[in-house]
């Protein structure tokens, strides 16, 4: 199958920019799918950064995603990107996310995985707070409860014992705040532009911001590394499309708790790839994380029934 046929088939499965019967449920489904793919992407990156500089990984990943956008849209992509009303906020978002990634990877060098994971997952809480301030979303008790239950699940699963205030802790928290801010900006821009145009703008900025460092620290990948690099491009590209389109369909405060599901995927992939056997606290935390998602699903279903009555 030719690349353009594959992209057309995938895009046709997503009603990009068109109304759907149940947008919130559709947004939730896309968000969970997107975070699952990004967890797989992170696993591939973890294998790559042992030998390939992270700048090069981000640069090549963005090149692959941008190429996919060109194949899907064609030559008109340049004109649509230049005329897009969301160019400025997407540039700001790209800069915030790049700083967030640098902060996260820097913190991960000095903190245990459990510690950096727990700190980073403050992002859904920050995102929900920002959604009430910036987007004027009305956050229900059920949504706040879901965010709180999900974060408790993360803490129990990660078990960050003995965590103290330090520079790496600050970096991890900074990553969480910047990521949450980026997601709020994504919701704001998602209502005014198609997902693949936003993806193109975002990845053009990442190419420009990582290109110099990638060239200066370039390492020619082996065949195995090239396969992993292609994998990261595919996972990140489809994952971005799912998250961007999910944000078009549902409010930030609804989708925020589902970011925690990536931790469940992470534990599963950790077992399959590295043989990391989850402990009992991991299963308890996973149950709480899944419960947070169910709280949102059932509360939104009840809200729809009440509105229809």
Language-model region placement:
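Transmembrane alpha-helices of multi-pass small-molecule transport proteins
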Residues: 6, 27, 51-99, 178-182, ...
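Loop-to-transmembrane-helix transition segments
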Residues: 26-34, 73, 77-103, 167-175, ...
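Hydrophobic/small/kink-forming positions within alpha-helical transmembrane segments
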Residues: 35-40, 70, 94, 98-102, ...
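Transmembrane alpha-helical segments that form core, pore/gating elements
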Residues: 43-46, 54, 69, 161-221, ...
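Hydrophobic/aromatic residues within transmembrane alpha-helices
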Residues: 48, 57, 107, 113, ...
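C-terminal transmembrane-helix exit sites in multi-pass transporters
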Residues: 104-106, 123-145, 217, 264-283
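Helix-helix packing/entry segments at the starts of transmembrane helices
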Residues: 117-122, 189-204, 240-271
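Hydrophobic transmembrane alpha-helices of multi-pass small-molecule transport proteins
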Residues: 142-158, 281-300
């Amino acid at each position: 199958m030719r690349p353009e046929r594959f992209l057309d088939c995938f895009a046709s499965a997503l009603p990009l920019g068109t109304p759907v019967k149940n947008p919130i449920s559709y947004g939730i489904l896309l968000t969970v799918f997107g975070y699952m793919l990004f967890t797989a992407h992170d696993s591939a990156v973890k294998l790559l950064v042992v030998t390939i500089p992270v700048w090069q990984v981000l640069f090549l990943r963005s090149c692959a995603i941008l190429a996919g956008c060109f194949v899907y849209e064609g030559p008109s992509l340049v004109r649509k990107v230049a005329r897009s009303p969301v160019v400025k906020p997407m540039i700001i978002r790209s800069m915030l996310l790049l700083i967030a990634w640098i902060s996260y990877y820097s913190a991960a060098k000095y903190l245990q995985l459990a510690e950096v994971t727990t700190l980073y997952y403050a992002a859904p809480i920050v995102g929900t707070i920002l959604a009430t301030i910036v987007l004027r979303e009305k956050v229900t008790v059920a949504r706040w409860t879901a965010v709180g239950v999900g974060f408790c699940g993360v803490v129990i699963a990660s078990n960050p014992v003995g965590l103290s205030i330090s520079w790496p802790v600050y970096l991890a928290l900074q990553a969480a705040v910047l990521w949450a801010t980026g997601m709020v900006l994504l919701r704001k821009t998602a209502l005014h532009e198609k997902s693949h145009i936003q993806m193109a703008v975002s990845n053009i900025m990442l190419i420009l911001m990582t290109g110099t460092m990638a060239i200066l620290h370039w390492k020619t990948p082996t065949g195995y590394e090239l396969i992993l690099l292609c994998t990261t491009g595919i996972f990140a590209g489809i994952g971005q499309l799912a998250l961007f389109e999910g944000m078009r369909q549902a409010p930030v405060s609804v989708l925020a708790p589902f970011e925690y599901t990536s931790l469940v995927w992470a534990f599963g992939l950790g077992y399959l790839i590295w043989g990391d056997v989850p402990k009992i606290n991991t299963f308890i935390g996973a149950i709480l994380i899944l419960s947070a998602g169910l709280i949102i699903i059932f509360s939104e279903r009840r809200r729809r029934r009440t509105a229809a009555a």
